[in-house]
């Protein structure tokens, strides 16, 4: 499970730890400054949700954890606990995949600590699992630089045209 790689990386990092799935392709130049702007010090975590009002789990192909923030440390402790104490954690949840677990914990913590950055918070998305609603990452500002080739997109070598819900200007999306 990738969550253990996340825990390990966080113990070896300082300031921010960013997770990016291995099936993510950086298609355009991305400067350090542009990358750093995606990680505001005022947020304890950044991630890609599925749009306003969505009841589904986040897209966990890219997220950043502000390791200097105590709330983030609490999140990481709970994220690990849910797996380590499975009988009192993950096995009590409706679904067991990392994105569902991640979303469950974030949603609980946002009640008292709402200072998160959801890259898709203001985005309109179709119903989840259809069209771009099931593939929000490329429809956020992250799509300017990266493509997440999840699922059968790996075989195609690129996300589907039907996944794109916003006007993309980058050359990568024109071909």
What are these regions (language model features)?
Residues 1-18, 44-49, 58, 95:
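A conserved donor-nucleotide-binding helix/loop in the catalytic core
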Residues 5, 62-64, 146:
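Conserved hydrophobic/aromatic beta-strand scaffold that supports enzyme active sites
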Residues 21-25:
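The conserved acidic donor/metal-binding loop of glycosyltransferases
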Residues 14, 58-74:
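Conserved nucleotide-sugar donor-binding
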Residues 67-173:
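Catalytic core and acceptor-binding pocket of nucleotide-sugar-dependent glycosyltransferases
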Residues 18-20, 46, 63, 117:
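Hydrophobic/aromatic beta-strand patches that form the interior of the parallel beta-sheet core
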Residues 26-58:
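Conserved donor-nucleotide/metal-binding helix-loop-beta segment in metal-dependent transferases, i.e.
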Residues 51-64, 90-94:
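A recurrent flexible, glycine/aromatic-enriched loop bordering the glycosyltransferase active site
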């Amino acid at each position: 499970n990738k969550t253990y790689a996340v825990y390990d990386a966080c113990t070896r990092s300082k300031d921010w730890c960013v997770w990016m799935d291995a099936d993510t392709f950086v298609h355009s130049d991305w400067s350090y400054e542009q990358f750093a702007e995606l990680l505001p010090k005022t947020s304890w975590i950044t991630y890609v949700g599925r749009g306003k009002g969505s009841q589904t789990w986040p897209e966990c192909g890219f997220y950043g954890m502000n390791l200097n923030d105590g709330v983030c440390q609490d999140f990481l402790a709970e994220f690990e606990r849910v797996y380590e104490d499975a009988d009192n954690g993950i096995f009590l949840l409706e679904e067991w995949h990392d994105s569902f677990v991640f979303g469950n914990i974030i949603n609980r913590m946002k009640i008292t600590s709402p200072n998160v950055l959801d890259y898709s918070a203001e985005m309109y998305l179709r119903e989840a699992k259809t069209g771009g609603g099931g593939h929000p990452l490329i429809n956020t500002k992250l799509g300017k630089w990266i493509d997440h080739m999840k699922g059968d997109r790996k075989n195609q070598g690129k996300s589907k045209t039907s996944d794109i819900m916003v006007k993309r200007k980058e050359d990568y999306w024109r071909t």
